[in-house]
From Swiss-Prot:
Residues 1-24 form the signal peptide. This is Alginate biosynthesis protein AlgX. Consists of two domains, with an N-terminal domain with structural homology to members of the SGNH (GDSL) hydrolase superfamily and a C-terminal carbohydrate-binding module (CBM) that may bind alginate. Monomer. The keyword Oxidoreductase does not apply. GO terms for biological process: alginic acid biosynthetic process. Its EC number is 2.3.1.-. The gene is algX.
């Protein structure tokens, strides 16, 4: 409370006393006590208290300067890598896009610890091995590049120390994992430099864009929210400038029906690419070309990628350049993600013969959809050669739960979930499992879990797939 406000309150109390017949000199000025706001409680330092799936993304919170919070597992990580299987899949994805004539740009965000470590308190700052983290982050960028990806180096944005005039324009929010619009802009400038050097950019039509402030947004941070759940505290809303980008010379909604539908650069990514941060707008401004943004909030690592690859837009008009933005918090060895992405890049079972197929109405419980040998002949259906294409009549279906049975009695339970925020078409495409010794398994049957109540129409096809070869030396990267 400011001294000025305290004086006003004291004067008000005195006037009230006078009106009640009491002498002002007998009235004491009000007293106030101020406690430090929002220091984390002991529970926030106990990983076992992070019980929900959502809370476990924030294990464990660390109080920093002011309202700044950090996560020890994600923000203060020093390791940036994946498993040999993850590197192999990344190579396959690159090669699959290359076959489609698409060049990939990987925007691998630096962590909040790398960028805003100067906001840590002295003890935590000393404990965080910044040099190790930075070295490993840069090594991961080189690994992406060694596989053929175009990789903007965002490491110059680390160890941020803003000038006095730029205070409040931090790269990341104080209590949220997202970058601010100012952070998005700084990243976009570096990404644009990388795009300009790509041969694929040479034939892309140029266009001038300009960006203006469009208002202010209030950010209730996700880290602050979790701290509130654990400690019962609340943090102040952080207000930040918002921006909008439009073609130079345009006004209002002039570009609503412009040629952005013919963009030859597409952005897929996480909620960092959402409208609030204007990352796609800054990309348009600094690249100097239309960018189609298909990212959506809550999409995670793969949500917008899978939705886009299954779209008519990608199938008929694949971009020359695909910018893929994601953060190090996502594991890059999640087999079910790569199986879906590679299956969609191979067009599922569109326009190719089905080795097995079925169309039926599902009932609650397990439904036997396809059986190898039902016609009297058992086919040699080996996992490494196959992919599955499942289509529900109801496009709003976002979960496929199924069981794949094999001739030797083994089975795989698979569950594919699309984000609640995604615009789905009811289609699920995935390659058959090939990690460990699954590649040589021979398929016997395919069961699908039906709805909780009522019925659900579905059709499924099993077909041969293309194999995207991986050079042996690249598949071993990171070992």
């Amino acid at each position: 409370m400011t001294p000025h406000l305290m004086k006003l309150l004291g004067l008000s109390a005195a006037l009230l006393a006078i009106s009640q017949g009491v002498r002002a000199e007998d009235v004491k000025a009000p007293t106030f006590s101020a406690e430090p706001c929002c220091q984390l409680c002991p529970e926030a330092h106990d990983a076992s208290r992070y019980t929900t799936r959502y809370q476990q993304n924030f294990t464990t919170l660390v109080q920093a300067q002011g309202d700044w919070l950090f996560r020890t597992r994600e923000d203060l990580r020093t390791e940036f890598n994946t498993t040999p299987a993850g590197y192999k899949r990344l190579q396959q994805v690159h090669d699959a896009f290359k076959k489609r004539g698409v060049e990939l740009v990987v925007v691998y965000q630096p962590t909040r610890g790398l960028v805003n470590r100067n906001m840590l308190n002295p003890a935590e700052k000393a404990a965080f091995d910044y040099q190790k983290a930075l070295g490993n982050y840069q090594a991961m960028l080189k690994r992406f590049a060694s596989m053929g990806y175009n990789v903007p180096d965002l490491s110059p944005l680390t160890n941020e120390q803003l000038a006095a005039a730029d205070q409040g324009k931090d790269f990341y929010f104080r209590g949220d994992q997202h970058w601010t619009p100012y952070g998005a802009e700084r990243a976009a400038k570096i990404v644009a430099d990388t795009v300009h050097k790509m041969p694929a950019f040479e034939g892309i039509p140029r266009k001038e864009f300009e960006t203006r402030k469009s208002g202010r947004m209030g950010k209730t941070g996700t880290l602050h929210n979790v701290a509130g759940q654990l400690c019962g505290t609340s943090y102040a809303v952080q207000y930040m400038d918002q921006f909008a980008t439009e073609p130079k010379g345009a006004s209002g909604g002039d570009d609503l029906f412009g040629d952005s539908g013919n963009a030859q650069i597409t952005l897929v990514g996480t909620s960092h690419s959402g409208k609030n941060y204007n990352f796609s707008g800054f990309l348009e401004q600094y690249i100097g070309a239309d960018v189609l943004n298909v990212a959506f909030p809550g999409g995670g690592l793969e949500g917008s990628m899978i939705q886009y690859l299954g779209s008519e837009e990608f199938q008929k008009n694949p971009p020359k350049i695909l910018i893929w933005e994601f953060s190090p918090l996502y594991r890059l060895d999640q087999e079910t993600i790569w199986r879906q992405i590679l299956g969609l890049l191979d067009d599922g079972c569109d326009d190719r013969p089905a080795l097995m197929s079925a169309s039926t109405t599902l009932k609650p419980g397990k439904n036997e959809l396809m059986v190898n040998g039902k016609g009297g002949v058992i086919k040699d259906l080996i996992n490494r050669n196959l992919q599955m294409d499942v289509k529900f009549e109801d496009p709003s279906v976002k979960v496929l739960q199924a069981t794949l049975w094999y001739l030797n009695g083994r089975h795989e339970d698979i569950k594919l979930e699309k984000p609640e925020t995604s615009d789905t078409d009811g289609r699920f495409v995935f390659q058959m499992r090939e990690d460990e010794d699954w590649a040589s398994q021979r398929l016997l049957a395919f069961e699908v879990q039906g709805p909780e109540s009522g019925t659900q129409k579905v059709e499924a096809k099993l077909c041969k797939r293309n194999n995207f070869a991986v050079p042996a030396q690249t598949a071993q990267a990171g070992q």
